[in-house]
Regions:
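Conserved SAM-binding loop of SAM-dependent methyltransferases across substrates and taxa
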Residues: 116-129
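A short acidic, Gly/Pro-enriched loop at the edge of an enzyme's catalytic core
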Residues: 104-105, 167-182
């Protein structure tokens, strides 16, 4: 088999020991084409409504209610709906962690290793504009990509960090209702998708990543409230990175215990090796293999913190008492999106709406705290791209709405000047530019011209 010849022999030996009679089926999966998936953003559109307008041929991912397989040649990243944040392109099995974590309205949620944002975008959609999502990546460059993706998705109640998980754990001990850790790993489940990862595995394999995982999983447990839930996942098959990381957690944090993950055909249980595993109920973990399901592969463990674990008090952020500029208030009079004055803060001319669930800032590298509403410039207010994406079309009263088939939509996304023959197509001031009823960004009409205000760094390339 051509593709498996290049796999390291020590990896093949480990998989043969792991899979036993399924080993040949696993090798055969390398002859199959890689799979492509997209996940619908239910914060902006229902699955039913998206399927009515979808320009792509889609097949349901059986265990993900808002996930679908697509054909590579359809190129959904080159469609205006992608720029409107109606879906996220994600490997099918990688959709599982955020799907499994039982996020509820009003929860305070932490995504520890979040870039580029596949899990965070789903967690934010599940919160449905309630609660608070704090999302983090230790790498500043990756955190920038994360910030863009959560803003494209229109998630308003967020804070984006670029910080060491241990430092965050010290700051937010016992703070979160839900924690997701899609841990850095050796990536064995991605070999079929990207065979360049094989060289990375040979350089830094399971032993390298296991040390990192053992540290961050303890930090995650420490950040949970009593009764809180944590989802640990990897895209690797190594027992050292998977079940053994969970064993380490359960030994070090006896207040944590495994709870069942809803079963689907093809999910495999965690691997039991001894009586301790049985006592810990390691079989409640889930493994996804490419020869069992239509996905590249994943490991998941859902855990809960005992309700009688010690509680921690966190001082709430004080409401804003700032006097808001008249130009800002004038703009907000056109918006029906729920903006509370006591949640608006102005920092270095930038205007933010900060979740009331967010405690006092300090001591952390914050990329974005709250929804960036816009910026004050010489006594005028300029709304942000992030605000445009967080709005529904019905929440603003000056609209330009074009069908996806209109060539001006792509021109807008490229930052080009737009031609409108009919003056009724727009109004003075800031217009919300939409495609088929879904916001893309801003345009400003003044002095007889409509200026394209689509964010330069997001433009269609």
């Amino acid at each position: 088999m051509k593709k498996t010849i290049n796999l390291p022999q020590n990896y093949l030996d480990a998989m043969k020991e792991l899979l036993k009679e399924d080993y040949e089926d696993y090798l055969a999966s390398f002859e199959e084409k890689r799979l492509y998936g997209l996940r619908i953003n239910t914060l902006k559109i229902s699955v039913e409504d998206f399927l009515k307008i979808s320009p792509f041929e889609l097949e349901p991912i059986p265990w993900i209610e808002n996930g679908f397989y697509f054909h590579e040649e359809d190129k959904p990243a080159k469609h205006p709906y992608y720029f409107a944040g109606l879906y996220y392109i994600q490997e099918p099995s990688a959709m599982t962690p955020a799907n499994v974590l039982p996020v509820e309205d009003g929860d305070v949620v932490f995504d520890m290793c979040a870039a580029p944002g596949g899990k965070s975008t789903e967690l934010g959609a599940k919160l449905d504009r309630t609660g608070l999502l704090i999302t983090n990546d230790i790498s500043n460059s990756r955190a920038k990509a994360l910030l863009k993706n959560v803003e494209v998705f229109g998630i308003p109640n967020l804070c984006v960090l670029s910080e060491d998980p241990k430092k965050i754990a010290d700051r937010f001990t016992g703070f979160f209702d839900k924690v997701l850790i899609d841990a850095p790993c050796s990536g064995e489940g991605m070999f079929r998708k990207d065979n360049k990862l094989i060289k990375s595995w040979e350089k830094n394999g399971p032993e390298f990543y296991s040390k990192i995982q053992r540290d961050i999983v303890l930090s995650g447990a420490d950040m949970l409230k009593p009764g809180g839930k944590m989802l640990y996942s990897t895209c690797t098959f190594s027992k050292l990175e998977d079940e053994e990381t969970i064993r380490h957690l359960l030994r070090e944090r006896p207040e944590m215990h495994l709870i069942p993950i809803p079963s689907y055909e093809g999910f495999c249980p965690g691997i039991i090796e001894n009586e301790e595993d049985t006592a810990m109920q390691i079989e409640k973990c889930v493994r996804i293999f490419p020869h069992k399901m239509q996905g590249e592969g994943h490991f998941l463990a859902l855990l809960e913190k005992d309700t009688d674990a010690p509680e921690n008090y966190h001082a709430k952020r004080k409401p804003s008492t700032e006097k808001l500029p008249e130009e800002l208030l004038k703009f907000l009079s056109h918006v029906t999106f729920p903006v509370q004055k006591q949640d608006i803060f102005i920092r270095d001319s930038k205007v933010y709406q900060v979740s009331p669930e967010m405690p006092q800032e300090g001591g952390l590298r914050i990329m974005r705290n709250g929804l960036l509403l816009g910026e004050m410039k010489k006594n005028r207010f300029e709304p942000s791209q992030a605000l445009a994406m967080a709005l529904q079309m019905s929440e603003y009263d000056k609209i330009i709405n074009l069908p996806a088939s209109d060539e001006r939509v792509v021109k807008y996304l490229k930052g080009e000047t737009l031609d409108f023959e009919n003056e009724n197509d727009y109004q003075d001031g800031w217009n919300l530019f939409c495609v088929d009823g879904y916001p893309l960004g801003w345009g400003k009409y003044s002095k007889g011209a409509l200026k394209n205000k689509y964010l330069a760094g997001w433009r269609w390339q």
